[in-house]
UniProtKB/Swiss-Prot annotation:
Gene Ontology MF annotations: [glutamate-ammonia-ligase] adenylyltransferase activity; [glutamine synthetase]-adenylyl-L-tyrosine phosphorylase activity; ATP binding; magnesium ion binding
Disulfide-linked positions: none
SUPFAM superfamilies: Nucleotidyltransferase, Nucleotidyltransferase substrate binding subunit/domain
Its job: Involved in the regulation of glutamine synthetase GlnA, a key enzyme in the process to assimilate ammonia. When cellular nitrogen levels are high, the C-terminal adenylyl transferase (AT) inactivates GlnA by covalent transfer of an adenylyl group from ATP to specific tyrosine residue of GlnA, thus reducing its activity. Conversely, when nitrogen levels are low, the N-terminal adenylyl removase (AR) activates GlnA by removing the adenylyl group by phosphorolysis, increasing its activity.
Family membership: Belongs to the GlnE family.
Annotated protein name in UniProt: Bifunctional glutamine synthetase adenylyltransferase/adenylyl-removing enzyme
Gene: glnE
InterPro entries linked to this entry: GlnE (IPR023057), GlnE_rpt_dom (IPR005190), NT_sf (IPR043519), PII_UdlTrfase/GS_AdlTrfase (IPR013546)
Source organism superkingdom: Bacteria
Pfam families per the UniProt record, alphabetical: GlnD_UR_UTase (PF08335), GlnE (PF03710)
Cofactor(s) required for function per UniProt: Mg(2+)
Keywords tagged on the record: ATP-binding, Magnesium, Multifunctional enzyme, Nucleotide-binding, Nucleotidyltransferase, Transferase
Region (Adenylyl removase): 1-440
Species lineage: Bacteria, Pseudomonadati, Pseudomonadota, Gammaproteobacteria, Enterobacterales
């Protein structure tokens, strides 16, 4: 065994002072001295439990002792009588075995592959032991869940990721998916429960038993977000629901995740075999599938962007050449050829590497280097985490922990360890790039073209200097360009850039100037880009991105030239520069029905318990998607209707995620309202009004929302801190508002306006569905019924959605006096015009002035309220374009008039979108849109003025 290094020998004196009673420096073995000096986790544990140290001193841990874990845990749980004592014993057992593993790992008593196996078996043993105890307890309370034939149904648990692969790291969280075989009901209990309810309750108790922090700590952080539909989906799914999802909706990244899926406590019974057989075709295709390479490349790009966003330097998992890249290399071959080559279907990485070598899919030397690098990195990761039982993959910055790792990795000192690490990661990166990398590089022609611009950049020409490369610009433009460059250089002198930053900037600027100054609008474009550059000069990562990826630089210039809104967004949030790397996604926004799934995948990389990071991630995702929508808008690939569709679907995905976060936080605090025990769903709905309800969001639109619940009176929550059920929903709505409006470094998510709720700002923030119906029928004003025309549920379970739709239909199909309605709608519009109309007499306010967008909206709303009692189909849609279509189809409005109003409406909205992209107000010269305005005014007179 390697003697302790000098810094660690000095630290040992600190350890001696903390030794438990009965142990002295002379009474301890050299092995104990080494472990307790290396790991604060081990030291703290034996201080609390001195008998563990005595046990380890008398008999060292063995390589195959994982075979005894299940028996040891069974003994530990023999006296458990309730959930609290179960949680205590699970935590005690986990800590005791983890100390044994840390001891064996630190002293290299067991090889590194076996350590990974022990960590994985420990987790599996604890999961299965907790599940089995809780299953029996739940059966005693509610009966045994059975299928219609009376066959008892088990809870099956899929371990995902490193747990599934038998490669768990020391302080890992665990990714799980819960499933049960067939629908049915419980039998033999005090009352019958549907199987879905039984297994949901069992799943919730199991997560609590493992995940909830107590005075004894926790067992594992449990992450359930890999299940179908993520946090918004059921906690536990039947086999049939799982099969439907993966056949019809399973995404590429879910396929990759499922490669490592393994049943916990698999005893190879009929249910287990059925589940494995069901999932296999989804994971391994019968044909050779080369689409995998691009998908994995995209995933790696997402991770690289995450590393930049979160400033994850020295990260041995996610960094270039890290553990994740080795996993990607192996998965490429599994997913391309696994359907044809059974040897590639292993869940574990090292056996799969052996299969890759046997099939000659990679050179022997590459496979050997990957194996050595993987074991090196995994040992380093485990040692790093075992110091404090902390989930981290970032190398330490302090001398003590660096000395610990150097000793644990058998290096002479920290620089030697870093040198070995650098070599291993370089080998991994080389193989990765050869296989799925796509680095760009400058061509010789581009270098030659940019060379003359070095003089312009580096020689700091004055505005009256002449240079051949600027000769094509007009005098004023040339002066502006030189002034902008000079001012930018002066600004740089005030910034702590550092030598590497200046070097990258000197490489970048000639290329940037060559591209910008070839444009007619060079001065304007440069004036938009220099603030962005000034914002990132101290963040070398982003300068390198623009320097190393010429395509990204070209897209930056094009987008900034086209839109000051995009330029200012990029300047404010430089992390958006990552989106410029892939033109395939930049100009092709996410499919309208895929925003929820994209967001779910994005949030999976953020710890569920880290609220601050979750808030940042939501805002960053929204900004990236807005950029892609705007880029497609500028490129002309999205018409105005589609722009609003995308902005609306994006907002709905955000609402879904925010409600989920708020719900999780509230349930953790109070439990959920007890009436939900008897029904599916959450008893909560979010209704979108205005532009959101009408599928007409713009780039900077706020969200008009109201919140509904269906909680009866006198219902309490079922958590340890009981509160009234209606109070729960009020706090939930307040939490949602808070999550939307909290300002982080990435800004707010959306401005939310909840004043359209019953009684406006004076009313309750959240309303029961019955109270909402009563208000609409007996108290609401006509303008509130107009608003209801453009309202729809944007989040909610089917029961509440149907209830809201029925109320909306009832209100809109109520017969009204035509003359009274006409007067009320017209007078409301005149009040709005007086209050909001354009104050610039020589300008036309596209939205608020006569003949503008609001007039068209009022015409549509008036006609729906006027005629829906005769033509109920008019209530079907909440957006103006389809309402106009319905009016024509139902004979209310002439088809030619409806078509003309639709064209006018989309034309005016298109102009508003493009004014927003130019950061201009929503008014234009009076001479603009005269034809459209005349047409709208004629229609207004026909419907709302004529007697």
């Amino acid at each position: 065994m390697t003697p302790l290094s000098s810094p660690l020998s000095q630290y040992w004196q600190t350890v001696v002072e903390r030794l438990p009673e009965g142990f002295t420096e002379t009474s301890l073995s050299v092995q104990a001295k080494s472990v307790l000096t290396f790991s604060d986790f081990a030291l703290d544990s034996v201080i609390a439990h001195p008998e563990w140290l005595a046990e380890l001193e008398s008999a060292s841990p063995q390589a195959d002792e994982w075979r005894h874990y299940a028996g040891w845990l069974q003994e530990a749980l023999a006296g458990v009588c309730d959930d609290a004592s179960l949680m205590r014993e699970l935590r005690f057992f986990r800590r005791r075995i983890m100390v044994r593993i840390a001891w064996a790992q630190t002293l290299s008593l067991v090889d590194d592959e076996t350590i990974l196996q022990q960590l994985s078996h420990l987790a599996e043993t604890l999961i299965v032991g907790a599940r089995d105890w809780l299953y029996a307890a739940c059966c005693r309370e509610w009966g045994t869940p059975c299928n219609p034939q009376g066959v008892p149904q088990p809870l099956l648990i899929l371990g995902m990721g490193k747990l599934g692969g038998g490669e768990l790291n020391f302080s890992s969280d665990i990714d799980l998916i819960f499933a049960w075989p067939e629908h049915g009901e419980t039998r033999g209990g005090r009352r019958e429960l549907d199987n879905a309810q039984f297994f949901t309750r069992l799943g919730q108790r199991l997560i609590k038993a493992l995940d909830q922090p107590t005075m004894d700590g926790f067992v594992y952080r449990v992450d359930m977000r890999l299940r179908p539909f993520g946090d918004s989906g059921p906690l536990v799914l039947s086999f049939a629901a799982l099969e439907d999802y993966y056949q019809e909706q399973g995404r590429d990244w879910e396929r990759y995740a499922m490669v490592k899926a393994r049943l916990m406590g698999d005893n190879d019974d009929a249910w287990s075999r059925e589940l494995r057989a069901m999932l296999r075709p989804f994971v391994f295709r019968r044909y050779i599938d080369f689409s995998v390479i691009q998908s994995l490349r995209n995933m790696k790009g997402m991770i690289a962007r995450e590393v930049r966003r979160r400033g994850l330097k020295d990260n041995i998992k996610l960094g270039a050449g890290g553990i994740r890249e080795i996993e990607f290399i192996v998965q490429v071959f599994q997913l391309i050829r696994g359907g044809r080559e059974p040897s590639l279907q292993s869940r574990s990485l090292l056996p799969t590497l052996d299969a890759i070598a046997a099939l000659h899919l990679l050179p022997e030397n590459d496979v050997a280097q990957l194996r050595v690098a993987y074991l090196f990195l995994r040992r380093l990761e485990n040692l790093l985490q075992s110091i404090n039982d902390e989930q981290t993959q970032t190398l330490p910055a302090d001398d003590l922990n660096r000395a610990r790792l150097a000793w644990g990795m058998k290096a002479e000192n920290w620089p030697q360890l870093v040198g070995e690490l650098t070599d291993h990661m370089a080998n991994v990166r080389r193989v990765f790039n050869e296989l799925i990398g796509d680095d760009e590089a400058d061509t010789p022609q581009e270098e030659e073209r940019s060379e003359p611009w070095r003089e312009v950049w580096q020689d700091a020409l004055q505005e009256d200097d002449s240079t051949p490369v600027l000769a094509h610009l007009a005098d004023e433009d040339r002066r502006q360009v030189l002034t902008l460059i000079a001012d930018f250089r002066k600004e740089l002198d005030k910034r702590p850039i550092g030598p590497r930053g200046r070097q990258v900037l000197d490489q970048l600027m000639p290329h940037l100037l060559a591209d910008v100054c070839s444009r007619e609008d060079a001065a304007v474009t440069l004036s938009r880009i220099t603030p962005l550059l000034a914002g990132i000069v101290t963040r070398t990562t982003y300068l390198e991105l623009l320097s190393e990826f010429p395509g990204a630089l070209k897209h930056l210039i094009m987008l900034c030239a086209a839109s000051p809104m995009i330029a200012s967004q990029l300047a404010r949030y430089p992390l958006l520069l990552d989106e410029l790397l892939d033109p395939g996604t930049l100009y092709q926004p996410t499919a309208t029905d895929a925003y929820r799934d994209e967001l779910r995948q994005y949030l999976l990389r953020v710890p569920e318990e880290d609220e601050e990071q979750q808030l940042e991630a939501l805002r960053q995702f929204k900004q990236a998607q807005l950029l892609r929508i705007a880029a497609a808008d500028i490129a002309g690939t999205l018409p105005v209707m589609k722009v609003s569709d995308h902005l609306t679907w994006l907002a709905e995905a955000m609402i879904d995620a925010v409600v989920q976060q708020a719900w999780t936080q509230m349930v953790a605090r109070y439990g959920q309202p007890a009436h939900l025990d008897e029904r599916q769903g959450r008893g909560f709905a979010v209704v979108g009004y205005g532009k959101l309800g009408g599928w007409e969001l713009g780039y900077s639109s706020d969200l008009d929302l109201i919140f509904l619940h269906d909680c009866p009176m006198d219902v309490m929550t079922n958590g340890e801190r009981e509160i009234d059920g209606r109070q729960f929903y009020l706090r939930l709505a307040q939490r949602i508002m808070h999550l939307f409006s909290t300002r982080t470094s990435s800004g707010i998510l959306y401005e939310v306006d909840a004043r359209l709720r019953p009684s406006g700002a004076a009313g309750m923030l959240v309303t029961s569905a019955d109270a909402f119906a009563d208000y609409q029928q007996h108290e609401a004003w006509t303008w509130e019924h107009q608003a209801l025309v453009r309202a729809r549920v944007v989040y909610g379970d089917p029961q509440l959605t149907s209830q809201f739709d029925a109320v909306r239909r009832t209100i809109m199909t109520t017969a009204r006096d035509g003359k009274t309605l006409q007067t009320e709608v017209r007078e409301m519009r005149e009040k709005m015009r007086a209050h909001l109309g354009n104050k610039h007499r020589d300008r036309f306010d596209i939205k608020a002035d006569e003949g503008g967008i609001t007039d068209i909206e009022f015409i549509a709303q008036y006609l729906v309220l006027r005629y829906a009692h005769e033509k109920p189909k008019l209530t079907r849609w909440s957006d103006n374009v389809r309402i106009l279509e319905l009016l024509a189809q139902n004979g209310i409005m002439d088809e030619h008039e409806a078509q003309a109003l639709t064209v006018a409406y989309t034309t005016l909205r298109d102009e508003l979108h493009h004014l927003a992209l130019q950061e201009l107000p929503g008014h234009v010269a009076q001479t603009c849109f005269s034809k459209e305005r005349a047409l709208v005014q004629a229609s207004w007179r026909k419907w709302l003025v004529a007697v």
